[in-house]
Amino acid sequence: MTRVFIANAKTEERSALRLMLLNLDLEVVGDASDWETTLVKAPATNFNLLLVDWDLLPANAVTSLSAMRQACSNAIIVVLTSYLDAHQQAAQSAGADAFISKGEIPNRLADHLLAISRNLNSYETTRSKNESESIPRSIL
């Protein structure tokens, strides 16, 4: 099962994402409203999918996402952004695996998240016994 951690400063957006994820039968294992809390709480939840709002990241997004990648190398990081074109290259450089525009209609957002979840679950079901093996970014 896909275990999702939500990192978003806005309570209403976290709540909406939580509801959508639960409706998609994805497990929400935690959330945080700031990056410092995310770095502390998220690794302890054993999440395998992090949804993070670009605006939540500190000024140096590359360093911030790199720290999360080091703590949780087997997780997929999906950046949610209001400005997909403007932030996509920066997010990719920072270590994000996927990008989703906050402007997407709910059904399209749900489709993106389900596709990521299916690919992640398929990989976890078939991966070798080497538990330390990182998730290939090509599954997205």
Could you say what each language-model-derived stretch is?
Residues 51-68, 84:
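Conserved phosphotransfer microenvironments
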Residues 43-45, 68-74, 94:
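Conserved phosphotransfer cores of two-component systems
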Residues 83-100:
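Alpha4 helix (beta4-alpha4-beta5 surface) of REC/receiver domains from two-component response regulators
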Residues 31-49:
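Acidic, metal-coordinating helix/loop segments flanking the phosphotransfer/catalytic sites
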Residues 11-30:
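Two-component/phosphorelay signaling modules centered on CheY-like receiver
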